[in-house]
């Protein structure tokens, strides 16, 4: 498993554990902003597999993962993040590329667990 996949799994465990303590019976919705189409789709699909493995290890039927395709596009990433917010998601894993983080500052009510930094220049 690549280092980024291990980090994602760790973030899921930490997020799920903390949310589970706060709301034991309530459904926990975690968003996943990843490229599922386009040139980077292989990375996105690998992350989906890693997240599903982590959720299976947690073995909590209250955790729901909501996938959104960013297509590695900043505007589509923002639109997908807003959709997740409308669906009640408060914690989002992703986006995974720094160019997709630039517009997410306006979504103050959501926590983004991104493995990138918007200050990194390509």
Protein language model annotation of sequence segments:
Residues 8-16:
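Bacterial N-terminal signal peptides
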Residues 22-26:
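Boundary at the C-terminal end of the N-terminal hydrophobic targeting segment
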Residues 39, 43, 47-54, 77-80, ...:
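Stable alpha-helical elements in mature extracytoplasmic
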Residues 74-90:
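Short, well-structured alpha-helical segments in soluble
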Residues 91-122:
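Extracytoplasmic ligand/sensor domains, especially the bilobed periplasmic-binding protein
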